[in-house]
Amino acid sequence: MNESSDAVHLNNHHRDTLVSIFQHPTSHNIDWKAVLSLLGAIGTVQETAEGKYHVTLDGTEHVMTRPRHKDIDVQTVVDLRRMLTESGYAELAQEVTDEGKEV
């Protein structure tokens, strides 16, 4: 992740979604559309005819399946954490969380 360019174009909704993904305990109400919006902001997302989503982050392609409901399940959160950590976004999530703690 290039911090100077990638962190700048994340709006507050993207940052909130990123923090929710890395939140402990795991959040059970992360909206699929919010996840797609975040992934589209930091990489590329292409939907296939089979309903799968090809997500490319930092040159690495991942395949995701649309959830049955509007929110993603715990396994998808785990997969997203892995993908985002590999792309350097765990640090940004921690920074955003720490900023929110400052009063």
What are the residue ranges of the model-derived segments?
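Basic nucleic-acid-binding interfaces
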Residues: 2-103
